[in-house]
Amino acid sequence: MTSPGSRAHCPFDLPASQALHERVRRFIDHQMAGRQSESFDSLAVDIARFQFQCETGVEKLYKAKNIDTGSLTLASQIPAVPTDVFKLRRVACHPAELDTYRFLTSGTTLGARGMHPVRDADTYRRGTRAWASQMLYPDTDRLDWILLAPPFADSPHSSLGFMLDDLCAATQGQATWAVLDGRVDVDAISRALYCANQRQMPIIMAGASFAFVHLLEALQGRNLALGQRGRVMQTGGFKGKSKEVEALALREQIARSLKIPTDAVISEYGMTELGSQAYEGRWRGWLGLEQPHEDFVCPPWMRVTT
């Protein structure tokens, strides 16, 4: 891919970049297997130093805070990059011609859209698949998907679409993309439910919160049954695309309309600017795998600071 007017980068060290990607993937694998791995801090610090040398604009944050990258020892010492920066400039070490994906934000703030360029999507896939299997479907490795979103091929700049498309591939079930021309296709959903029931496959329905509002409106009070092991993943806000519904009320309406327990409605937190996702612990609690709770759980390769 190329991008008109892209900023010229300093010489990009591809082998060093790839070595960092491989370390991240190894860290993910070791964490999921419960094996000893290098520390989060040492990996994060090495990534920060590499990014500093790339002259992406991140180095200005260090200079503004008078931080010497050579003295970094903890991830908490690395300055956070404001999301607005992704709207104002390209944030990537690699040159634009090495982009394999360019994920764009929704542009709900001031109409500007941030961009997250990706060179090696395998690292993104590794973390996404690992944590989804832990939080969304720890009880099965195969399930069918009903996606309240347009097909990823029609929205190639959507990080959510990329994630959903990849999780469908990882779980080897059938995928039904149930949004056509901006409209929720209830008939397609009904057919997908029938087929999954005939094959005795568990189902997950996934999409943004506003898409579930559209689904509820399209149902007009009718109910659908996701089945005994059915679950829902909802994410994001309403982004001005539907009426706003209070979170608890929406959860209850979804559960009632799809005939599933409220703990089977799992909220996901993700951002285009991030490569990792956090999930509520409701479903794992309902399955008896841990104490039920409503907190968002981050993967070991993601750190939240306040």
Annotated model-derived regions:
Residues 57-60, 159, 214-215:
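Phosphate- and divalent-cation-binding pockets in alpha/beta enzyme and binding domains
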Residues 31-34:
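Secondary-structure edge/capping motif, primarily at the C-terminal ends of alpha-helices
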Residues 38, 50-104, 111-119, 124-125, ...:
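Active-site diphosphate/adenylate-binding microenvironment
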Residues 2-28, 38-50, 142-144, 151, ...:
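Active-site glycine/GP-rich loop and adjacent strand/helix microenvironment
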